[in-house]
Amino acid sequence: MSQIYISRTGPPGEVSERRPQPRPVPGPGEVLIRMKAAAINPADLNFIEGTYGKKPVLPCVPGMEGSGVIDSVGETVADSFPNLTPGTLVLPLASPGNWSTWRVLPATDVLALPAATDPLQAALLRINPATAWGLLHAAAAPAPDSWVVQNAASSAAGHCVIQVAKSLGLKTLNFVRRPESIASCLAIGADLVFLDDADGLTAAKAALADAGAPAPALALNAVGGDSALRLLDLLGIGGNHVTYGAMARQALKVPNGLLIFKTLVLRGFWLSRWQESLEPGALTEIYLTLARLANIGRLQQQIAATYPIEEYLAALTHAATSARNGKVLLTF
């Protein structure tokens, strides 16, 4: 039984350490979780480096996503939370802290998942599926059969957008960097996929015209630079352009004419802040909806590899590789 911790920020492979972890005892109102799996996300690596929007309070255990099984519960839990019983698969809602064999959390920070949920897919529910849901609801929710356009469609978040949008009755127009990424997007329900360049933009406009489709009302930008401008070009009057990433590391420079004559709305999205804005209970319902989609095969995330926690250094190296095909997870 062990956990990964950091006492300083820096390169993840240098500042992350593994230490033994004795089995804790939950107090009143708490549950003890035996973790099953935890994701290694780019946000986790940035968190360890000290470059994420939320700075670590040192020393700490990283890990924003994970799933586990309740091992035992403290006093009062059985009466107040009858669904949190030993053996129940749960989603820890408090983070960081998931790169650990054991977690003790208040019962209020734990969500019981449907029994059929795959623990590996459950460990990937908190960030990308929730991001997709939040992005699609960041502005006024698009009407069924309306079009949403996005770049970085082959990313984990992009794949989630395609699948969640499909479950909501929306159509997606997607841009990818590489030709080999087109098939994977179509396989999970993308309606249209084009290369993210000038020719791709021309082809996208022609495809929308051929379909008799109105201009998209929502664009989701994870890249920035010229790619973000192509999304703006496709939006209709009054459309919303939501930025949640900056993969190209290029500033978003918007021509005045697009803002003036199309009255576009530009906004940012950060998952943590969006979650804080939700009404009590809303986040629980969102995660349960996402879990149900995962259970019926309509929301699946690709997994590149799993590593036992003892091999955390190899896992960190793999997770930092841009060429990996899917998510990297620690198992316990």
What are these regions (language model features)?
Residues 200-214:
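Short amphipathic alpha-helix with an adjacent loop that forms part of the alpha/beta core around
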Residues 89-152:
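NAD(P)H dinucleotide-binding glycine-rich loop of Rossmann-like/cofactor-binding domains
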Residues 22-39, 51-97:
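Glycine-rich beta-strand-centered segment in the early N-terminal region that forms part
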Residues 81-84, 142, 235:
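Short, well-ordered loop/turn sites that connect or cap secondary structure elements
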Residues 175-179, 222, 245, 270:
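N-terminal Rossmann-fold cofactor-binding loop
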Residues 226-298, 331-332:
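Glycine-rich phosphate-binding loop and adjacent beta-alpha segment
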Residues 126-198:
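Mid-domain Rossmann-like dinucleotide-binding core that forms the NAD(H)/NADP(H) cofactor-binding site
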Residues 213, 298-305, 313-332:
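C-terminal capping/lid region of NAD(P)-dependent oxidoreductase domains
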